[in-house]
Structures are given as structure tokens and as C-alpha cells.
Amino acid sequence: IAYCYLLNIGRVVLHYGQNLHPILDSLPEVFYRPEDLYISRQWGIRTEEWMGYRRTASEATVLAELACSVKTAAPTLAMVDGSLIYWFLDQLPMDARDRILPPILEAWQKLQQAQIPLIGYLSASRSTESTNFLRFLACPYPVPNCITYCPNQLEYVPCKKFDTLRDTTIMTSQLQPGQRGPLWRSNARILELYDEQIIYFCYVHVGTEIARIEVPAWVVTNQTMFDQALGLVLAQVKKGYGYPVAIAEAHNQAVVKGG
């Protein structure tokens, strides 16, 4: 019995108004060599986890290559299911991280050079990054400094009342369908390693929910590109009856079927 792992990356390209056939397929990659399967053990990382990290890097590379190869004069959007902020990298040793993050940043650089906007789509986000600012309003001290004013009582600090409040909860009462909230720059520590690919996010009422949208800085600074990308996201959600159809179909393509 051969011990191996299969990464099957779904690829989807949907053209609209161009009379072109869609691309619906997947790229399988089998890992079976000991140097691929067990390299992560030196860092104390289980093989299953390491394969998940490898998949993240491979997905970024495949997306950039695919988007650049099919780019036309028509507006183009590269979409990722989930966050562009890879929190798991923060806990990895430097040698392990250097095998995952550089290919991702290189892929994003290709998209930037091709002027293809990149968006990370998060459904049912549980983030509290923006609502954390409400803690300032609840702080009774002149300058927020938990270590100085609230030592050894973090379970009872005045600002803790906002702990259970999610960003999407606030935005549900503020946004109408089709509207987006303000742009925020994420302060995740791992972004210090992203070089110029700083990640911003906003919340968009897509009709069925409040979705979190993440984009690199080079998309945000191009207002036309950013607005166009958000419009394409809304169109994708509408066509998918509540969820981006391209992402949903990519999931279907990635499923390994017997036959």
C-alpha cells in the first residue's frame, strides 16, 4: 500500500457576454515521495496540516496562472474562497513559512502586473477586527492602557462588554443590499511579512448576508478597479443565489469522484 496525498484544485473561468465556453476542470497533484510527505516533521507539523498549507500556496499559483492566461479586454476578477490573511503562517517556523508565503506573494504580484483584481470572499465571517474599535468608547480611562489600569482583571475590564459582538452584527443594521461599509486596514501581525501586499477589508451586503471582502492594497488604491471588482462580486452572488457561483463551482470541480 502506497502512502500518499492528493491535492485536487478546482479551476473555473466563467465568461459573460463573450460567447466563450467556460473552463470547468481541476488540477490534481499527488504527493508520495518521503521528502514531500515528511519534511514538515522537522518543524513539528503534522503531514495533514502541511498538505493543507501546500494547498493554499498551490491555489494561489494556479489562480494567478489561470487568470493571466485568459485575460481579455473585458473586466476580469480573480476570486479566492476565504481570507487573504493566512493566520496559520504566524505560528510556523521561519523555514516552513518560507516554503509557503513566497509563492503566494509571487502569484499576487503576477495579478497586480496584469491588473487583475484579487478578492477574498468570506461568508459567515466571525471577525471582530472593526468592532474592536468600540472598546475605546467603553474605556473610562484617559488613555487606553490595559496593563496600567486593568492589571490582573482582564475578565472584568469595562470594554469586555463588546467581546461577543461581531463585525457582521454591526453592519447588518447599517447596510442595505448592494451597499458596502468603510474600508479597514487589517492589523494582523502576519501582514508584516506581506511586504507591499497589505490587506484591506470591508463588509458588503450581498442580499442574503453580510460578506467580508478582502483585497490587497493595490486594488484599493485603484478606485475604478475596486468598484468594478465589487460589482462583479455582487453579480456572482446573484447568479449563485446567495453565494458566488464561480467559487461554488470550483468546490464541485475539486471533489474527487469515482468512475
Give a label for each model feature.
Residues 1-37:
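Acidic, metal-ligating active-site segments
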